[in-house]
Amino acid sequence: MSCQDYVDKQLLASRCVTKAAIAGHDGNLWAKSEGFEVSKEELTKLVQGFEEQDILTSSGVTLAGNRYIYLSGTDRVIRAKLGKVGVHCMKTTQAVVVSLYEDPIQPQQAASVVEKLGDYLVSCGY
């Protein structure tokens, strides 16, 4: 499967994710959902935030021009929210899976779908 297939057939098809992208650690976009215009700068800062959560705590998580409030994170997962829209991101060996979900989808539902794909990508060396 291509990265675009993972976005379309794994993340969006689950109906637990409303927008998604997969990018390399360098911020280069590998695939994205239609209308999700996330920039290389936003992705680069997000990837940096996995190691340095302080930058996200102070300035939030910006995706497609929208600034989300950073909720929590580890070296593997980042969570943020703005109003009724949540963010769940997972870092793999070579990539980052970025997702947005909206009410009434629960955070755990989006997390499950994103992390299942992330774990699969890790098992494949990505």
Swiss-Prot record:
Keywords: Actin-binding, Cytoplasm, Cytoskeleton. One of its GO terms (cellular component) is cytoskeleton. Belongs to the profilin family. It is found in: Cytoplasm, Cytoskeleton. The keyword NAD does not apply. Its main location: cytoplasm. This is Profilin. Binds to actin and affects the structure of the cytoskeleton. At high concentrations, profilin prevents the polymerization of actin, whereas it enhances it at low concentrations. By binding to PIP2, it inhibits the formation of IP3 and DG. One of its GO terms (molecular function) is actin monomer binding. Gene3D superfamilies: Dynein light chain 2a, cytoplasmic (3.30.450.30). It comes from Apis mellifera. The lineage of its organism: Eukaryota, Metazoa, Ecdysozoa, Arthropoda, Hexapoda. InterPro entries: PFN, PFN_euk, PFN_sf. PANTHER family: PROFILIN. Occurs in many kinds of cells as a complex with monomeric actin in a 1:1 ratio. It holds the Pfam family Profilin.
